[in-house]
Amino acid sequence: MWRTLRNAQKMALINQGYRVLGEYKLLEQAELKNIYALPSYASGLHWFGVIFIHSGIYAGSMFRFSILLPDHFPEDVSLPTVIFQTEVFHPHICPVTKSLDLTPCFREWKKDQHHIWHILKYIQTIFSDPEGSVSVTETPSGDTVTLNEVHNREALNLLSKNRMEYIKRVEESIVFSRKHMYDKPPTDDAHYIVFEPYSADRHGKAMEQLKPSNWHNTVDTMATSLPAKCVARIDSARQLHEEEAKQEVPVNRKNLKEKKLTVTANSRRLQNY
């Protein structure tokens, strides 16, 4: 009896491990930009995450966070816990515990509807549109939720009544996050996301491999830039390359059309002869 129970618990842990791996696979397939998360090496129920923000009120910030899944995930209907590493001024983030309120988007966890990438998408949304995140919200399942309470009432009041002061407080969060970007990791977990200042000697070779054909030399400016800005430059260069390719297509088609007309005209001349 005891052995049977132990085997059942072991199988449950194995099944849970596969479900967590499946969540990570779905996250990769979602292809979310500028936000990253992965399970820790020590436990699949503890995820490390980081978000880079390039536009809006929170532009220029980099916030780390952890996602703590319930012990019986995904069967448990209780919501995962999201905790930011540094204090972030936002109506949905508690200034004391640094925890994120997920209830505007999720009433309870439904394993057949909700996935971890939905949490990451929600995190992106609250930073890109803070005003919208505190108004009437629609959950992924289609339910409408009216917000009556938030984790940070002061942030909500400033956002609605004194936007300039709100922005000032947000900028304090941004400066603090950038200042501590390269801090020593609080854990020795092998999967913790670590950043280092750009070094041409150490990272130059890797950057060379990432360069598209029309890459502009920005190594000197990257030395003092955030890693997120480096990624933005890579994305911009890739988009520029794609746009140039699109512009070349109509020209090539036009040339082909002109060549076809020339061949047809020459054929008619030969027939006349």
Swiss-Prot record:
- Please state every residue range assigned to the domain named UBC core: 15-164
Q: Which InterPro entries match?
A: UBQ-conjugat_E2_core, UBQ-conjugating_enzyme/RWD
Q: Name the Pfam families for this protein.
A: UQ_con
Coiled-coil regions listed in the entry: none
Q: Which family does it belong to?
A: Belongs to the ubiquitin-conjugating enzyme family. FTS subfamily.
Name used for this protein in its record = Protein crossbronx-like
